[in-house]
Amino acid sequence: MKKNISMRKFVGGFAENKDIAKKMRTDKVMPTLSKHGEVVFDFDGVSGATQSFIHALVSDPIRKFGSTAFDNLFYKNANDDIQEIISIVYRYMQESMDSKNYEE
């Protein structure tokens, strides 16, 4: 199962509203990942995103599903700025998970 999400439809030209990210996460991302499906975030027409938006969108799925989330979340048509923010959030989440595993 693959869930394609047109980000522009939900966020307009700039992804910054954490409440929208939370709703997308709850209504679309988590149910799809729980069925081992893939989620494709299509950023066509979106010029930028805040780090807090991306964090609100993917941090809980990564925490809950771990490697399944890393393997099944995809980003299409993300410009360089958005790709960099996604990378920052992924690095932060990976370091956070590694540190938690180290402490256990």
Region annotations inferred by a language model:
Residues 1-8:
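Short beta-strand/loop segment at the start of cytosolic alpha/beta domains
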Residues 10-39, 43-91:
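Amphipathic alpha-helical interaction surfaces in cytosolic regulatory modules
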Residues 98-104:
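Extended, charge-rich low-complexity interaction segments
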